[in-house]
Amino acid sequence: MKLHELRPAEGAVRDRKRKGRGTASGLGKTAGRGSNGQKARSGGGVRPGFEGGQMPLYRRLPKRGFTNIFANVYNEINIDRLNAFENGTVVTAELLKETGVIKKIEKDGIKILGNGNLEKSLTVQAQKFTKSAIEKIEAAGGKAEVM
C-alpha cells in the first residue's frame, strides 16, 4: 500500500446534510427552522435587547451618575514596569510612550503606582506618585521628581 492508495474506512465518511433539499434529506421543508414565524424568515430575528414588546431591562433600570468633565485623567503605571529601563535612565512620559509602555499620554500626565518591586536606580519624572512608589524608587537609589 502506498500513500496515494489510502482511503477512509467504508462508511466512515458521510455527505454533509444539505438544508432545504427535500424531505428525504432529513432537513427539508422547514430546514431546521421550525414552524413559520419571524425566525423562519430570511433575515428574521430580533435585535439584541428586544424582549418581545415588553419594556426591556435597559429601559426599566434608571440612569445613574454622570461624567465629570473636570476629572483628572492619568496614565497609571505600576513601578515594576520601570524595570525595563537601564540603570541611571531619566524616565519621562515621552520615553514611556516611545518604548511602548503606554500608548498615549493622557491630559493630566503620568501617575506612578507602588505595585511590584523596582531593582533599577532611575530618575522618574511624573505628575503624581503614590507614597509607596516614592519609597521604592528612593530605596532602589533613584529619584522621584514631581513635574
UniProtKB/Swiss-Prot annotation:
Signal peptide start and end residues: none
Listed GO MF terms: rRNA binding; structural constituent of ribosome
Q: Where is the composition biased (Basic and acidic residues)?
A: 1-14
**Pfam families from the UniProt entry:** Ribosomal_L27A (PF00828)
Say yes or no: keyword Ribosomal protein present.
yes
Q: Which GO terms describe its biological process?
A: translation
Region span, Disordered: 1-54
Give the protein's function: Binds to the 23S rRNA.
Tell me its family.
Answer: Belongs to the universal ribosomal protein uL15 family.
Record note on quaternary structure: Part of the 50S ribosomal subunit.
The name on file for this protein is Large ribosomal subunit protein uL15
What species is given as this protein's source?
A: Alkaliphilus oremlandii (strain OhILAs) (Clostridium oremlandii (strain OhILAs))
Q: Tell me the gene name.
A: rplO
